[in-house]
């Protein structure tokens, strides 16, 4: 597995990310991203220049999970949003590795704090 920055150059990867949002949240928060288009809208927002957008890929380049971050307070604080892992690979530590990588990305950008909102 490798974790990389998603730059939005691969339309197929963006569609995989959008579908992951729909699939990963369907059971516990079905109103989050109900359609592929709603997922694509979120992915486009994740790819804005000031944000963090990282993907975990398997050896074949298929999407296993993703994590995003939104800078706040001049980049001193980062909101972790969203985090999603393919349901069929839950329990393998992919989410944990994405969060550890996210912490490194925030630190490299001078961030001091990471928040996780629950108001959505």
Sequence positions of predicted segments:
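A short, internal acetyl-CoA/4′-phosphopantetheine-binding micro-motif in the GNAT/acyltransferase core
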Residues: 83-90, 119-120
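Acetyl-CoA-dependent GNAT
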Residues: 5-77, 81, 86, 99-101, ...
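Conserved GNAT acetyl-CoA-binding A-motif
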Residues: 106-120
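Extreme N-terminal starter segment of soluble prokaryotic enzymes
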Residues: 1-3
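Glycine-rich phosphate-binding loop
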Residues: 93
């Amino acid at each position: 597995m490798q974790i990389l920055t998603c730059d939005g150059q691969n339309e197929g990867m963006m569609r995989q990310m959008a579908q992951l949002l729909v699939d990963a949240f369907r059971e516990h928060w079905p109103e989050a991203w109900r359609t592929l288009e709603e997922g694509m809208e979120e992915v486009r927002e994740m790819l804005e220049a000031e944000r963090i957008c990282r993907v975990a890929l398997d050896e074949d380049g298929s999407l296993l999970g993703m994590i995003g971050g939104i800078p706040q307070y001049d980049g001193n604080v980062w909101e972790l949003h969203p985090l999603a892992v393919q349901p069929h690979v839950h329990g393998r530590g992919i989410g944990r590795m994405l969060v550890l990588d996210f912490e490194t990305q925030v630190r490299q950008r001078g961030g001091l704090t990471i928040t996780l909102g629950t108001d959505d």
